[in-house]
Each structure stands twice: as C-alpha cells, then as structure tokens.
Amino acid sequence: MSTADDFRRIFAYNEKVLQSFSNALSRLSWETLSKNMEASHNSMKNIFIHILTVYNGWINYNALGKSDSIPWEQHDPKNYNSMNQIVEFMLSAMKGVTRFMDELNDPKLSKKITAPWMEEEHELSDVLMQVTLEQAHHLGEIIALLWQLNIEPPQMTWIDNT
C-alpha cells in the first residue's frame, strides 16, 4: 500500500506535468484549443478542464466532506473563453491540492470518501489513485491530439519529471 509520502511524490510529478501541458496548450490558438476533435470531451480545452475538475471535485471538495459546495460553474467548459481563465482555475485548484497534500498523513489514506455522482464510498488512497490515473489517460488523449496536429507534446515520463 502507498504511503502519504508516496502520494506527495506522485502528486508533485502530476502537478509538474500538468503545468507543462498548460504551457504547451497556452501556445496554441484558441480556435485550435477549443476545436471539436471528436475526443472524450471533444476539444483539448474541454479535456484539460475535465482534468482540473477531477482534482477540484475529488480533492478540494469531496475529500474534505464538502460535496454540497462543489462550484459546478467552474467545472463547465462553456464558462472559459481563454487559456488565461483556464490557468487561473488550474492555479486555484492546485493551490488547494497542495495544501491538502501537505496535510496528508498515512491514517487519512483509509478515510472513506463519497461523491455525489457515485453510490459507494471509496478510500482516500483509491481517490488519489483515481485522480492520478484520470490525469494520465486524459493527457494521453491530448498527446494523441497534438500528434494529429504535428505538434510534439511535453515530456511526461516519470523518470524525466521526478
């Protein structure tokens, strides 16, 4: 089983990679970023926002027992009209995540977490893995979309980013 220190290391990697992708996406035109490319959430913009909402919803709200306070308007891609707005949301969400990770300890990993969109409770350790894997597979999707545009994606290998 992973420890709080393991998760802090993983989340430091996650944040570094997320920032690299934010920088890469910021170099694209808004038209390219928001174009429907028939992906899971249609556009790279929407996919990236989805990753941020996973962090924000699971860690900044559900894990803190504040599921009723999730700011759904922040989670709606239609409310974003520039990459600057998305970066502001990312910085805000990740500030909460960093604070959460700083306070994480091993006993908290077994805490039961509920989410309004799921029927069952899940241990915090599983929630943290879900957030990590969600980022990985959606960034993989963005990588494929960048390749379709002949754009080299940011480096995201664990070894190069830790």
Where are these regions (language model features)?
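Exposed alpha-helical structural elements
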Residues: 6, 57-58, 85, 96
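Helix-adjacent hinge/juxtasegments
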Residues: 65-104
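Basic/polar N-terminal segments that are highly enriched at the extreme N-terminus
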Residues: 1-5
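Acidic catalytic patch
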Residues: 102-117
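Short alpha-helical interface patches
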Residues: 30-35, 79-92, 108-109, 124-130
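Short, contiguous alpha-helical
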Residues: 7-23, 27-75, 115-162
